[in-house]
Amino acid sequence: MRESLTRDLGFSKEDREKNIERITFVAKLLSRNGVGCICSFISPYQSIRDNVRANTTNFLEVFVDAPLDVVIERDVKGMYKKALAGEIPNFTGISDPFEAPENPDIHVRTDKQTVAESAAYIIGELEKRGLIPVAEPA
């Protein structure tokens, strides 16, 4: 999304709100036309998440959680390195706050679970809620 629909936006709170608003608009448009949507993005403010929840249907908040040091270690784009050097202002977790979700529907700890374990847990939760069909054993 950052390379297309939201390329004009930075990392200020206002720009992050616009980013989420645009993504939500597209997801709602797709959903109205029978397309299921899974949106993955950094949403650092509880108020923004609450707004999306209030204005969409079948919304599930999945908190993919890891301590900041682990996130920095995993940063393949070097964004955190730039933010720590002061090259990117208003960067989540560095020079701008991250408000952890108060009550996420699904919570995975990727510093304690493997990618496969985290994915299996999320899929299992979606199956339990009837949002995706239960996978047949192989």
Task: Tell me what each language-model feature is.
Residues 2-15, 27-84, 90:
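ATP-dependent NMP and nucleoside kinases share a basic, alpha-helical "lid"
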Residues 12-20, 112:
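Flexible, glycine- and charge-enriched loops at secondary-structure boundaries
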Residues 19-29, 95:
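Conserved alpha-helical scaffold flanking the Walker A/P-loop in AAA+ ATPase domains
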Residues 27, 122, 126:
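Hydrophobic "lid"/C-terminal helical patch
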Residues 29-32, 128, 132:
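Conserved amphipathic alpha-helical interaction elements at protein-protein interfaces in regulatory
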Residues 65-68, 72-120, 129-138:
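Small-molecule kinase domains that catalyze NTP-dependent phosphoryl transfer to phosphate-bearing small molecules
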